[in-house]
């Protein structure tokens, strides 16, 4: 392992490193503190660590000695806090005053703001951050046997220098000797495989648990060396996954004919609301992939009313259509559209044309909500939206940066296939003409083959059409998120995802057409067309078609579809 990188998120934290054996970044799994190790988590993001902390009172001699600052630079002994899943589990029923569910936002602007207390001592944002990072580094040592001495940390693109200074002071006091910072949009660009040889404008849509942030940044090779991106415009709204959980819970409660008061001072009511919010999150994530899911947790007594068919109550089933309606009623889609349009309108020299935005990067688990990808696809085109690893992109990019292994040039990130039909069965045949990982531009005849027109109706063929599909697949045990032409989300690979591949037609409804003159007889099984495909510098798949019977060139490097 090498090239350590930390993506400190508001809700979840990812720790990644560069795997020399496989030549790629990987998230480090810390089973004792991560989300749901080896579970049936529908999103399969178990290696993320919840960014929560409960500060403990130092009771034992080892704990007190381990918290001595001069010693912490050299070794991390004892335990000063619970972090991640153990902290969540311990505070699920009754939250301790020493439990801090979020500290990143306060650390950025008010590091001395009290967020809790342990005994008579206040827990400031800075103390909470230090306790979390200390235990995270200690867990890495326990799990891998290695101390992290060289680390890249991702930071929000508009983070104040004070935020960087706070993190630097904390991490250096914990024994990190070489520390570098990398702007999150730049890390996401590297994680999604963007080459930064030339200047490009990138829009990062980051929707996490707490916020919806849309940033338009300009990336340059020089900025990569410094780990910085130039911010052209940014919009932030308090509209993330946590708000959606509340909307889902309210929707389900209305359907069941009950209410759980969010402002109640009664501990039992607050406990039930916390538990039901967690269930709302589970159901919400389940319908990312399923048509519907049942809400399994109900307050005492209500289950009997539902089973008895009490007036105003019914089983708590949430469908994907229900979730879309909840998002619409809550203003989620309107907020996203408004943020995108406002960012485009606030360029430093005036409005920025859509064509000048080269890439759209989706970051954060809430970008998987129904309707988000289709909204961006419709606005910018499928060929610009990179969305297959919203949880890992920032951490992967930072690990690549840490190991100095980022890709200097652009490459094609999906397989693209040319669709033909079997002469006997008429079934579609998908032949990959541009494999994933291809650098571009290529030669105009990067792929070439001689083809026989199908004559599917048994009559002379007068037309030929070029239909191209995107093929979503993954390698090894990893998983990717892929959207089909209807905008539905699929998980490819992983433990519970779809096996094999997902084929997405790109131009089936409007294929590139050519005419055969004279028509091709169905009895003639000799090749009639020589078809060549290539990729130009703008990622257009181009086609050259030669009529072998007449010797005429029917197409000469004609653009077919835009690739990603």
Regions found by a protein language model. Name each.
Residues 1-25, 195-229, 362, 525-548:
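Gly/Thr-rich phosphate-binding beta-strand-loop-beta motif of the actin/hexokinase/Hsp70
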Residues 31-174, 246-293:
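Phosphate-binding loop and its immediate beta->loop->alpha context
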Residues 1, 179-207, 393-408:
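Conserved phosphate-binding catalytic cores of ATP/NTP-utilizing and phosphoryl-transfer enzymes
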Residues 87-100, 104-107, 114, 118-119, ...:
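Gly/charged contiguous loops adjacent to phosphate- or pyrophosphate-bearing nucleotide/cofactor binding elements
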Residues 129-144, 185-196, 325-360, 367, ...:
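Phosphate/ATP-binding catalytic cores across multiple sugar-kinase/actin-like superfamilies
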């Amino acid at each position: 392992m090498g090239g350590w990188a930390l993506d400190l998120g508001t809700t979840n934290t990812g720790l990644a490193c560069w795997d020399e054996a496989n030549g790629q970044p990987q998230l480090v799994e810390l089973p004792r503190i991560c989300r749901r190790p080896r579970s049936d988590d529908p999103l399969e993001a178990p290696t993320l660590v919840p960014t929560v902390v409960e500060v403990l009172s130092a009771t034992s001699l080892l704990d007190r000695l381990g918290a001595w600052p001069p010693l912490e630079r050299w070794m991390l002994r004892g335990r000063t806090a619970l972090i991640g899943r153990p902290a969540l589990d311990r505070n699920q029923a009754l939250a301790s005053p020493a439990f801090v569910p979020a500290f990143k936002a306060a650390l950025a602007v008010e590091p001395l703001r009290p967020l809790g207390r342990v005994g008579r001592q206040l827990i400031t944002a800075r103390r909470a951050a230090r306790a979390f990072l200390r235990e995270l580094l200690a867990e890495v040592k326990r799990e891998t046997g290695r101390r992290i001495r060289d680390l890249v940390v991702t930071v929000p693109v508009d983070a104040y220098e004070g935020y960087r200074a706070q993190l630097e002071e904390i991490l250096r006091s914990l024994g990190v000797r070489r520390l570098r910072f990398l702007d999150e949009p730049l890390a996401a660009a590297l994680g999604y495989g963007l080459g930064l040889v030339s200047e490009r404008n990138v829009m990062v849509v980051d929707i996490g648990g707490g916020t919806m942030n849309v940033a338009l940044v300009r990336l340059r090779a020089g900025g990569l060396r410094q780990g910085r991106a130039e911010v052209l415009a940014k919009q932030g709204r308090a509209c993330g996954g946590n708000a959606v959980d509340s909307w889902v819970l309210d929707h389900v409660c209305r359907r069941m004919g009950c209410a759980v008061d969010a402002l109640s001072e009664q501990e039992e009511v607050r406990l039930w609301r916390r538990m039901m919010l967690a269930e709302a999150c589970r159901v919400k994530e389940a319908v990312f992939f399923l048509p519907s899911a049942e809400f399994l947790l109900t307050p005492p007594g209500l289950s009997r009313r539902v089973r008895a068919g009490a007036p105003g109550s019914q089983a708590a089933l949430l469908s994907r259509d229900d979730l879309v309606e909840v998002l619409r009623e809550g203003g989620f889609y309107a907020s996203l559209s408004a943020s995108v349009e406002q960012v485009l309108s606030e360029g430093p020299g005036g409005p920025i044309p859509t064509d000048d935005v080269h890439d759209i990067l989706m970051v954060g688990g809430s970008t998987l909500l129904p309707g988000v990808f289709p909204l961006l696809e419709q606005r910018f085109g499928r060929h610009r939206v990179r969305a297959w690893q919203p949880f890992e992109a920032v951490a992967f990019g930072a690990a690549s940066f840490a190991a100095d292994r980022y890709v200097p040039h652009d490459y094609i990130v999906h397989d693209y296939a040319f669709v033909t039909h079997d002469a006997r069965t008429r079934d579609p045949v998908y032949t990959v003409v541009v494999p994933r990982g291809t650098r571009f531009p290529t030669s105009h005849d990067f792929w070439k083959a001689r083809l026989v027109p199908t004559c599917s109706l048994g009559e002379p063929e007068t037309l030929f059409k070029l239909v191209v599909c995107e093929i979503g697949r993954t390698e090894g045990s990893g998983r990717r998120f892929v959207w089909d032409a209807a905008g539905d989300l699929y998980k490819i690979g992983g433990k519970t995802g779809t096996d094999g591949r997902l084929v997405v037609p790109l131009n089936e409804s409007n294929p590139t057409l050519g005419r055969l003159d004279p028509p091709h007889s169905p009895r003639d099984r000799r090749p009639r067309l020589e078809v060549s495909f290539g990729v130009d510098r703008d990622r257009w798949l181009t086609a050259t078609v030669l009529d072998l019977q007449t010797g005429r060139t029917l197409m000469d490097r004609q653009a077919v579809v835009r690739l990603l």
